[in-house]
C-alpha cells in the first residue's frame, strides 16, 4: 500500500528553496491559481505555498486554500514528477468553493505531469 503522509521532506522550507523555483519555473495556471515547478534532484516532489493577504483578506480563507492545496498534493504525490512546486494564489481564489478549487488543482497537477514528460 502506498504511503500518503506529508512529512517535512515534502515541503519547501527556506527562502532559497522558493528562489530556486522562481528562477526558471515551468508554469501552469488558471486565473485564480498558478503552480510554478522546477525539476529537482531529490527523487520526490516538494511543495511550497504562497497565499498573500493582499489577494485573500481573511485568515480562515487563506487557511482553507492552503489546507486544500496540501491535501491535493498529498494525494497526488506519488504520481507527480520529482519537482519543486510553488503554488501562488491570486485574486479571486477565495471565491472558489472547495470542489472548484480541488478540480482546478487536479487539472494543474496533470498539466505539470505532461510538462515534465515533455521536457
Swiss-Prot record:
Keyword field: Endonuclease, Hydrolase, Nuclease, RNA-binding, tRNA processing
The record's top EC class is hydrolase
Q: Name one GO cellular component term.
A: ribonuclease P complex
Q: Under the GO molecular function aspect, what terms does this record hold?
A: 3'-tRNA processing endoribonuclease activity; ribonuclease P activity; tRNA binding
Return the Pfam families for the record: Ribonuclease_P
Q: Give one GO biological process term.
A: tRNA 5'-leader removal
Q: Which domain of life is it from?
A: Bacteria
Q: Does tRNA processing show up as a keyword for this record?
A: yes
Hydrolase listed as a keyword: yes
Reactions catalysed, semicolon-separated, are: Endonucleolytic cleavage of RNA, removing 5'-extranucleotides from tRNA precursor
Write out the transmembrane intervals. none
**Gene3D superfamilies linked to this entry:** 3.30.230.10
- Listed as disulfide-bonded, the cysteine pairs are none
UniProt cross-references to InterPro entries, sorted A to Z: Ribosomal_Su5_D2-typ_SF, Ribsml_uS5_D2-typ_fold_subgr, RNase_P, RNase_P_CS
Record EC number: 3.1.26.5
Q: What does this protein do?
A: RNaseP catalyzes the removal of the 5'-leader sequence from pre-tRNA to produce the mature 5'-terminus. It can also cleave other RNA substrates such as 4.5S RNA. The protein component plays an auxiliary but essential role in vivo by binding to the 5'-leader sequence and broadening the substrate specificity of the ribozyme.
> What family is reported?
Belongs to the RnpA family.
Name under which the protein is recorded: Ribonuclease P protein component
Question: What organism is the protein native to?
Answer: Salmonella arizonae (strain ATCC BAA-731 / CDC346-86 / RSK2980)
Amino acid at each position: 500500500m502506498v504511503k500518503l503522509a506529508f512529512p517535512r521532506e515534502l515541503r519547501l522550507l527556506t527562502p532559497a528553496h522558493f528562489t530556486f523555483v522562481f528562477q526558471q519555473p515551468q508554469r501552469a495556471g488558471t486565473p485564480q491559481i498558478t503552480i510554478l515547478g522546477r525539476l529537482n534532484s531529490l527523487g520526490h516532489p516538494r511543495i511550497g505555498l504562497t497565499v498573500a493577504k493582499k489577494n485573500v483578506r481573511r485568515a480562515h480563507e487563506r487557511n482553507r486554500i492552503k489546507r486544500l492545496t496540501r491535501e491535493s498534493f498529498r494525494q497526488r504525490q506519488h504520481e507527480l514528477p520529482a519537482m519543486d512546486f510553488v503554488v501562488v494564489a491570486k485574486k479571486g481564489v477565495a471565491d472558489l468553493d472547495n470542489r472548484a478549487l480541488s478540480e482546478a488543482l487536479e487539472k494543474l497537477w496533470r498539466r505539470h505531469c505532461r510538462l515534465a514528460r515533455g521536457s
